Amino acid sequence: MSTDKPWVKNYPEGTPDHLELDPNRTLITLLDEAESEFQELTAFSNFGSTLSYKEVEKLSKQFAAYLQNDLGLKKGDRIALMMPNIMQYPVAIFGAIRAGLIVVNVNPLYTPRELKHQIQDSGARTIMIFENSAHVLDTVFSELEIEHVIITKIGDLLSFPKGIFMNIAVKYLKKMVPPYNLPEAIQFKDTRKAI
């Protein structure tokens, strides 16, 4: 183990501390290869639910198709992703990259002023936002040129019935979702169409 890589001691047994990558292979090529080789293995987990590589590929392709076909986004358009580390994030980032979009990462803890600057500076016209942060966008929405808002909830990709219970608990019991008014917003669950 290298002393300049102290995190390596936390790697699972058999995990190399260095990967040789071909600079001509894209992130999507790597994802497709991983899906082909590890289809049923867990790619991501959150709150006790998992997504296999096969599921990530399917969901990211569905999301990419939605962005292109339903929202009309084109290669080079920018999409802001304002989410914590939840399973929707890798689906959204891989879907956006599959669609040829430029991803603008936005801290879900940003203040309205910080969010406004990030969106204006990046030129993003679409945002996928965690419901718990939607009130921040609502505060500055009229000052931005956002055309599409996609809202995701904590439980959107969790297993049934855990996802439903989690959404109810977060919003109504723990009251962790401040009120917001974004009437034209699209719900992430509605973007999951068969391709």
Model-derived features with residue positions:
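Flexible, non-catalytic linker and terminal segments flanking ANL/adenylate-forming cores
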Residues: 1-24
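Conserved AMP-binding/adenylate-forming core of the ANL superfamily
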Residues: 19-23, 40-74, 80-86, 90-94, ...
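Ligand-binding pocket scaffold of soluble enzyme catalytic domains
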Residues: 20-23, 33, 101
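Conserved donor sugar-nucleotide recognition element shared by glycan-biosynthetic enzymes
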Residues: 27
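Aromatic/hydrophobic pocket-lining residues that form π-stacking "cages" and hydrophobic walls in ligand
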Residues: 31, 92, 137
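Flexible acidic/glycine-rich loop/turn elements at helix↔coil and beta-strand↔loop transitions
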Residues: 33-39
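Alpha-helix N-cap/start motif
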Residues: 75-76, 103
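Structural core segment of the AMP-binding/adenylate-forming
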Residues: 98-192
